[in-house]
Amino acid sequence: MDKQPAHHKESKMVITYDQRRPEIDDIIAIYQSSGIKRPVQDADRIREMYRHANLVITAWDGEKPVGIARALTDFSYCCYLSDLAVRAEYQHQGIGKRLIGEVKQAVGEQSMLLLLSAPAAMDYYPKIGMETVSNGFMIKRTG
């Protein structure tokens, strides 16, 4: 994926999107700023989360990572978007929507994209064109 600039109407900033992986400290900073609940106190666990992810799309303001989408996919049938996070000061500018779009483009039209939403974000995803599903199940983590 080439860097793809996006001009945001609310400011003169140019956000680029690509598959560079930020440093772990930068990922943790994005998580902390965004409000997403992840084990940010455990850098080794975050490192492992990214080591095993096979698709990561990032949003950059110059050399500063401002948003991230982490996914697990087979690139042919299904893609699980496990993380979507945008720094608080960059939210409400279309960056999250664009990150989801970049993930969908990377996995192709033949792949379904699914995610688990935080309760606070349940109203967000339908606004950007995602459907709510009720036929899912999970076994919660114990650690």
Model feature map: region roles:
Residues 21, 75, 118-119:
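Alpha-helix N-cap/helix-start capping motif
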Residues 90, 94-99:
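Conserved acetyl-CoA pyrophosphate-binding loop and the N-cap/start of the following alpha-helix
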Residues 45-84:
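A conserved beta-strand-loop-helix scaffold within acyl/acetyltransferase catalytic domains
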Residues 2-43, 136:
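Short amphipathic alpha-helix that is part of the acyltransferase structural core
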Residues 111-115, 119-142:
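Conserved active-site alpha-helix within GNAT-family acetyltransferase domains
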Residues 84-86, 121:
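Hydrophobic adenine-recognition pocket in adenosine-nucleotide-binding enzymes
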